Design a protein with these regions (language model features):
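Beta-lactam-recognizing serine transpeptidase/beta-lactamase-like catalytic domain environment
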Residues: 1-2, 8-245, 288-292
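Short, gly/Ser/Thr-rich active-site loops of penicillin-recognizing serine hydrolases
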Residues: 161, 165-171, 261-292
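Short, charged, low-complexity patches
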Residues: 132, 252-257, 261
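Ligand-site clamp/hinge motif
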Residues: 246-250
Length: 292
């Protein structure tokens, strides 16, 4: 997930009392730990940041600091609370590689440096786009984790009845303080403001959008590459929709943010005429004798 995971680290750090809104960390571009140098390449000059700043600029050093103090065990607990790495009931594909190191003796033991990488969404973190969208949805709605549904309802061909209706199922409630949620939401708001990692994409957008960019470091078949991710929700003050886009090999998440903007244009009928906006597609069954 890359840096789209940083909201989990922020929430865990705030709720566990490791940081507060008044905790500031100075980033010089590098972080020394255990004889290793961990880098932050997300801003050009040294900065002193709090948690909202760290989300806005996607500062690795801030989250390295939180990850070192938090430890992987506590971070994994919060990861599970948000449903990351657990089956959604709809998604196909890999889930969180729980206990992978213990199951495979060929994999080295977890090291302290892995806590740092996990805190910024690297290391063994591996989640589906649906899991990521669902976890951000739980943040913006106040802590309710839902089981995703693919189809809300299907109407009969003459609109007289519903042939199928799926009600949202609550998977769990996540206890997050209002203060923690407000700090994280503010950070996601500033991501799309001027100077934020997606600020240039949403600078003139008519609806306020919250979001988070991410760059997931991948290594497959002897080659390394970066996936770009962007998660967004809108409108900021009354969220209706959460979108997660992954661009394989796209690099930085800002490079896929325009795709999310296009999807929001479509959802909110931005830039369309009133007549076009009124023609909303519905899940309607078609009578067999209408098919040619």
């Amino acid at each position: 997930p890359g840096s789209t995971f940083k909201m989990v680290t922020a929430i865990a750090g705030l709720e566990e009392g490791i940081i507060s809104g008044d905790t500031y960390v100075t980033c010089t571009g590098t972080y020394e730990y255990g004889g290793q140098t961990f880098r932050c390449n997300n801003h050009d000059t040294p900065m002193t940041l709090n948690v909202t700043d760290a989300l806005k600029y996607s500062c690795n050093t801030f989250f390295y600091t939180v990850g070192q103090k938090l430890t992987g065990e506590h971070l994994e607990q919060w990861t599970k609370k948000f449903g990351l790495g657990t089956a959604t009931g709809q998604a196909a594909g890999p889930t969180y590689r729980e206990q992978q190191r213990k199951a495979d003796p060929a994999i080295r033991e977890w090291q302290g440096g892995d806590d740092l990488n996990a805190a910024i969404g690297q290391s063994d973190n591996g989640f589906t786009p649906l899991q990521l969208a669902n976890y951000v949805s739980a943040i913006v709605n106040g802590g309710t984790l839902y089981k995703p549904t693919l189809v809300k309802s299907i109407k009969s061909y003459d609109y007289s009845s519903f042939m199928k209706t799926d009600e949202s199922e609550v998977r769990g409630k996540i206890d997050i303080s209002d203060a923690t949620r407000e700090l994280v939401m503010q950070g996601m708001s500033e991501v799309t403001d001027e100077g934020g990692t997606a600020g240039s994409v949403f600078a003139d957008y008519p609806i306020k959008v919250g979001g988070k960019t991410g760059t997931a470091e991948m290594f497959e078949n002897g080659e390394s590459f970066d996936n770009g991710l962007f998660i967004a929700f809108a409108p900021f003050d009354n969220p209706q929709i959460v979108i997660c886009v992954v661009g394989e090999g796209a690099g930085h998440g800002a490079y896929v943010a325009p795709i999310v903007r296009d999807m929001l244009d479509e959802y909110f009928s931005i830039g369309k005429s009133d007549s076009a906006a009124s023609r909303q597609a519905e899940n309607t069954l078609i009578r067999k004798n209408n098919c040619k």
